[in-house]
């Protein structure tokens, strides 16, 4: 998108869906992402005349609620928009964050998105740059060392694993 000079809402909204699909194809799931991005852009133009700055004038709670009303935007995407685009101090919880925390026993396996997010926000200063960097580091550790098959022996967080190894989900009851 950067190479095609399409980083503005106006430029993206003017594209036909097929054009946008081709541009974001390398990101994977391009058809679904195209629909969701178009839903966001349509909302932005219908309610805020295409102005992200006007949308971002809303308080964080209201902005998050409005983002969650858009078809295809869930908590992780809404919080990513809040943190990375609107520069709001809200912690993003993704698969890697969950996996790293739960395997180290730092949070219960049953913890949902809101519980994990509240854990971070209760223990870190509300600083968007800190949240951004912390999340990026967890994603990196998760991607490189804590995938579906863990590589604990190489992980920089290995020394903080429980003595008996990674925590696993409780057994499913019949």
Label every model-predicted segment.
Residues 1-173:
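Catalytic cores of DNA base-excision repair glycosylases
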């Amino acid at each position: 998108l950067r190479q095609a000079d399409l980083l503005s809402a106006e430029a993206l909204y003017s594209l036909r869906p097929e054009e946008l699909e081709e541009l974001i194809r390398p990101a994977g799931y391009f058809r679904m992402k195209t629909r969701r991005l178009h839903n966001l852009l349509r909302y932005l133009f219908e309610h805020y005349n295409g102005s992200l700055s006007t949308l971002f004038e809303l308080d964080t709670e209201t902005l998050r609620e409005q983002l969650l009303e858009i078809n295809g935007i869930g908590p992780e995407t809404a919080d990513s928009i809040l943190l990375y685009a609107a520069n709001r101090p809200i912690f993003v919880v993704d698969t890697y964050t969950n996996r790293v925390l739960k395997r180290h026993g730092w949070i219960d396996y049953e913890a949902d998105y809101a519980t994990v997010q509240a854990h971070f926000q209760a223990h870190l200063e509300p600083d968007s740059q800190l949240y951004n960097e912390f999340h990026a580091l967890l994603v990196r550790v998760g991607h490189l060392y804590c995938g579906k098959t863990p590589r604990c022996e190489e992980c920089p967080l290995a020394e903080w694993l429980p003595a008996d190894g990674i925590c696993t989900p409780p057994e499913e009851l019949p």
